[in-house]
Amino acid sequence: MTVSPKLGTRHSLEVLKVIRNGLLLDGGELGEVLLPSREVEGQTLGPGDSVMVTLYSDGEGRPMASLRTPRIQLGQVPLLKVVSTSKVGAFVDWGMPKDLLLPFAEQKGPVREESWVLVILTSDREGRLMVSAQLDRFLSDTCQAYQQGDEVSLVAAHSTDLGYKVVVDDHAW
């Protein structure tokens, strides 16, 4: 079974054709996805070749591809740096050509440029990528069954009267 490519994730996609602007890739349900020529300078890729890319959308909502590896993928919970603020929210750097919006409604409190925020990558009702700091809406209060000695990834979220609240494996508190 083939996994359908989703925005905010990395996938190996097949090159369909070479065009003036870059390469058109087979994005499955997303349709043709552009990998801009500036991303593939010096590489010889052609129809039938596979290339590992990160999928995101441009300013007009069209799916795009990049060879860059982002700092966050769909469903992950890292600290990201706020690079600017605007009348719709803040923008965080995820290592891709277009910064991600952290809308005011998704903030835990006001954020400033150069601050770091703990966020999860998700999408809005229209399917556009965004981040949220309202982690309670996305994380479970119960962890999967772990065995003693299992490795987990932890991200400290904030302190409480009892200690620190941590995110376990990007999906639970």
Ranges and model annotations:
Residues 1-173:
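Single-stranded RNA-binding regions, centering on S1/OB-family and related RNA-binding modules
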